[in-house]
Amino acid sequence: MSKFKVIEIKEDARPRDFEAFQLRLASPEKIKSWSYGEVKKPETINYRTLKPERDGLFCAKIFGPIRDYECLCGKYKKMRFKGVKCEKCGVEVANSKVRRSRMGHIELVTPVAHIWYVNSLPSRIGTLLGVKMKDLERVLYYEAYIVENPGDAFYDNESTKKVEYCDVLNEEQYQNLMQRYENSGFKARMGGEVVRDLLANLDLVALLNQLKEEMGATNSEAKKKTIIKRLKVVENFLNSNLNANTDSDEAVPNRPEWMMITNLPVLPPDLRPLVALDGGKFAVSDVNDLYRRVINRNTRLKKLMELDAPEIIIRNEKRMLQEAVDALFDNGRRANAVKGANKRPLKSLSEIIKGKQGRFRQNLLGKRVDFSGRSVIVVGPKLRMDQCGLPKKMALELFKPHLLAKLEEKGYATTVKQAKKMIENKTNEVWECLEEVVKGHPVMLNRAPTLHKLSIQAFHPVLVEGKAIQLHPLVCAAFNADFDGDQMAVHVPLSQEAIAECKVLMLSSMNILLPASGKSVTVPSQDMVLGIYYLSLEKAGAKGSHKICTGIDEVMMALESKCLDIHASIQTMVDGRKITTTAGRLIVKSILPDFVPENSWNKVLKKKDIAALVDYVYKQGGLEITASFLDRLKNLGFEYATKAGISISIADIIVPNDKQKAIDEAKKQVREIQNSYNLGLITSGERYNKIIDIWKSTNNVLSKEMMKLVEKDKEGFNSIYMMADSGARGSAAQISQLAAMRGLMTKPDGSIIETPIISNFREGLNVLEYFISTHGARKGLADTALKTANAGYLTRKLIDVAQNVKITIEDCGTHEGVEINEITADSSIIETLEERILGRVLAEDVIDPITNSVLFAEGTLMDEEKAKILGESGIKSVNIRTPITCKAKKGICAKCYGINLGEGKLVKPGEAVGIISAQSIGEPGTQLTLRTFHSGGTASTDLQDRQVSAQKEGFIRFYNLKTYKNKEGKNIVANRRNAAVLLVEPKIKTPFKGVINIENIHEDVIVSIKDKKQEVKYILRKYDLAKPNELAGVSGSIDGKLYLPYQSGMQVEENESIVEVIKEGWNVPNRIPFASEILVEDGEPVVQNIKAGEKGTLKFYILKGDGLDRVKNVKKGDIVKEKGFFVVIADENDREAKRHYIPRESKIEFNDSEKIDDANTIIASAPKKERKVIAEWDAYNNTIIAEIDGVVSFEDIEAGYSADEQIDEATGKRSLVINEYLPSGVRPTLVIAGKGDKAVRYHLEPKTVIFVHDGDKIAQADILAKTPKAAAKSKDITGGLPRVSELFEARKPKNAAVIAEIDGVVRFDKPLRSKERIIIQAEDGTSAEYLIDKSKHIQVRDGEFIHAGEKLTDGVVSSHDVLKILGEKALHYYLISEIQQVYRGQGVVISDKHIEVIVSQMLRQVKVVDSGHTKFIEGDLVSRRKFREENERIIRMGGEPAIAEPVLLGVTRAAIGSDSVISAASFQETTKVLTEASIAGKFDYLEDLKENVILGRMIPVGTGLYGEQNLKLKEQE
């Protein structure tokens, strides 16, 4: 940043361009130099002559003439007197525009504080003087005295408490001290003057050094905080001239006394105008009233002082003056705002600039535009993709200047006046010229709300009659438009550059893909889908079936002559191959480009298939082919939707016959459940849940029945079925409401009403049912309204935080990346690896796990084909470049971003990716739900909540798993964490018996086997191995990673597997709870039926070392007995198409070298066809088991006090149950005393049932007690939009879990102040201590090993903790998977990279931990870029650089903390931002979009990026 020259802004010559913008405090001299005269009178204009009063607020002498080049009295009129000052009225002859820029001033009799620097926290004046804000206000408003010189004064008679400099005294203290110490130099005053003097006398440098010393001396955190606050303000003042030019007067740093105002600037009058309304009234800007109050009070004060009025009156007047100035700057900051004549508070200068209606957002960021119009839209089915219909009347207005020029050019009119007359009369020549003007001149259409870039697109206008704009049906999806009265705005681009941009970038035929996901957005919908679907249907036995046709022409003739039905199955030749198809599908084929393969069109085409077709055509054929293809598709769809004559009638709605039976059955079940509840066998929560389950399943059964009926009806040509099946309109759920039953309804609070609506719409609803229905409908409407506002606000915050992210360079050269794998939630896949990798650049080579060769090199851009190969290769995780790890100085580099999804190519420098990301995330916000879901208070009984079973084949490995045998001989899991059951297949087997050795060298892990004679080594990549914390389920996923079952130094037998690939894993406690029963043994094979999955030839292999040896003598019916058996399916070129591992005990179903189909089962499991269950447990209770043998004793467990006795009626057994509410300090505990002095303690939760008695002898693994899971209070799951905004705002959750910061062993220490103390001791001797509230449920046990990042208590993981403990990459994984879960759950596809861009902005600031020799202060939040620049500067000078840690800021905080003053001020908290910036003399280098829009410069993206790099041309030698 070289030294900038200050640009003087002159009235007539405004600077064309500038490089930076600085905010500073203005000194009184500066204000005077701006002023053109003092405003002395409060008058505005003379009500009779309507001329401004002299010396008043609108005075022409000070501010300039009212009319152009004309003085007030009229002596000088005309241009030629420019610059002359009239002798009579004193007005300078000039352009009247100067009234917008000339300022005046008011000389205040007494200094007045600027309210921003007093009242906005932290109070700057107070901080500098070291006075509390409240006290400072008392001094300024003449209620208290401030000590100017303490002299030798003491507060008490014993002279112990000294009066300090800047102490604040009340009246009584002041009088007392004055009497005693007046002669010894004591002096105190009140009001603005003394504050100004105190500020003027401050020696900032000395204060700075003093504060730094104090900072070093103190140990108290609170003191440090206040010192740092003062330090910041002092440093800001001292550094406020760092970048100014040394020779100009700007070089003086800001002075503290400038925060007090002695000369008050007066705004130029045209910026606070008086507007004459009809009827002789005036509309006055509020600022004028506020100025009038200031002037009145100032003049009155002047008079009183000249008259030598009593002190008390003068004080009062000074206070009133201070209040008047306060109101002018920020009315309403103090308690009582000044009200105007109409009883509403006056709008002060602060209010004018802030808020939605303020200057920034209303006039600078959004302006009204010339050459624009709006009208209602109607559909224009005849238009081409890039056309829109523009009403002639509108075109006439919009293109008027062009038209005038055209009329003159063609000689139809000789003067402009004549041309205007012609246009008014609308002669034929006018229309002729209009056609020519409009041709080739695109217009832009925009539909509000403009949620993403596709809401503004360019079209070539076609002139139409009528008054409505015609819109192409396919672009409706992008605009989110429909034709129920929507309006759109038209804008005309004027400059050649704008026209070119419209034609090249914004034309609708260029915007086929959605920038959010890369899917095509111009997909036919509704009628068009229906037409094409109808065309592609096949009807058995239709007229002309099985005919042979030569081609499309013959088919069309046959259809015309009625001897062939459109749905008839026919045979024909395509590309020299005979195929069977239908007449309709051939018609579809006739509009397709030639390169579309048969399997894309020769089938029933539903909406998804049509979308895939469009995507395919775009990927293969490019823009032009796609645009014309879409138009043909649209025409075909509309034509056949019309010819099909599909309509809805009541007869199409078919009610299932056995509906009544099903309903009666359900009612019977409900009665039974109600009875069990009445008997007290089940809780009310269980009753409610079960009843709802019954009705849900009844509804599902009926819906299935009904769909079957509708599908069979008219051989699949039932109108309603066709609409739903094709995806044109409606869904199975809606049809089921029409034909089966309406189903369960929700109450306004989101809970489900347990009586369903049994009727359907065809039968009609009764009154009660109708009433229940209306709830839902109304809630829907209310929700939508709220949702729109919330989603809009989220978008605005995202835009603001990401607006400065753009692609600046091609490649930043980093080798760093983030490892990604598929995102799963509760075993369902949310986003596959293939989807996540698409359009990204690899940060590391991808190694094929089978051949060990490099599949894709580092730096490869993954397109669809490559992503598909990757998906099929079985690779589970890949390292990719991301915006978070990008090392570009500013912005992001193209390689770290990847493909620009809107056009499917690598992104180009200059692309505003930040804005696109924010739009992509914000735009679907309106489709997300608003609700937080309430989950009931009972445990659900799904299978997955009772057991886990293997889905793949292989053999079992236990990782760290300990088990106890109980009385029945079952194996019970004894670990509470850090253990897992793995399903693996072998990758390397030992060639001979020997000792294993494992060593890490850089990025490699070397596994060697050695006996007396020989040694072999296998090299693995470190990052392919599963890490301990991944195996324990703390972070990442383990599928496809390698596992080493042996440690160094162990003896290993021959043919033993020493390196294994993990196929599935179940960790304790997330997938297998503590005390579950394990049903498999370590090393046990797991057999499944294996389908081939590919066509080809079977070849069997066995693993030797790390290579495969061919085995040929394999026959059908063999049972595999050896580890490491594989089968490979080879394709016709003898390349490997697919490989399967065959576990031991599998039965082989085909001989070696036999040819098979992809659907054949090649390996059968042994007779038991059940899936292999790995573990199972009690679904309703958390079980507590004994870990040692011993004797039980009770602590704090007493019937009738902390527990109740229950008698089981069936068995007559008595058991104790812990009460739900316990007295404070009571902790029911079971203690088992074992051998010696070994004892284990178990704290019991409320509602726990105890199965043992005091003094019982028990054995290891016995069940002591069970806590019902239902007792866990029902949690509200935040979902939908609130969840997204919670994540982006990085809010600390209310019930955040405490998380371990280091790996280590847990120890419980003595409780401290009723908090539990947990200490984690790491192996290297470090330890971390945690104090945990009693209310939290602790999830760890004494003596357990725990990984960093695991929860110590229940609760939600806070994203701040993830960042602090596990680092940025883990945060990246956490945030993206959480946000994607919400969007994918609603069926919205957003590419990860958009979320990454926002996350990279949330991480753009760091917190200084140690400031070294830099200018930062400990605890400062600074942007990474500033931090890096400052450190580089210090290192160059040989100093000590600063150290910082990353922080995660919510999007609002990140946007306000922007490096750019203007963009932060225009976002939120305007006054606060401007206050800070002015004191520090902050520079805004105008690098981002928003500040350039505000200042009206070209924005630095796209072509504007190159405008910054001024190009110099040299002549060739």
UniProtKB/Swiss-Prot annotation:
Its EC number is 2.7.7.6. Binds 1 Mg(2+) ion per subunit. Transmembrane segments: none annotated. Zn(2+) 1 binds at residues 71, 73, 86, 89. Zn(2+) 2 binds at residues 812, 886, 893, 896. GO terms for biological process: DNA-templated transcription. It holds the Pfam family RNA_pol_Rpb1_4. Keywords: DNA-directed RNA polymerase, Magnesium, Metal-binding, Nucleotidyltransferase, Transcription, Transferase, Zinc. This is DNA-directed RNA polymerase subunit beta'. It comes from Campylobacter jejuni subsp. jejuni serotype O:2 (strain ATCC 700819 / NCTC 11168). The lineage of its organism: Bacteria, Pseudomonadati, Campylobacterota, Epsilonproteobacteria, Campylobacterales. The gene is rpoC.
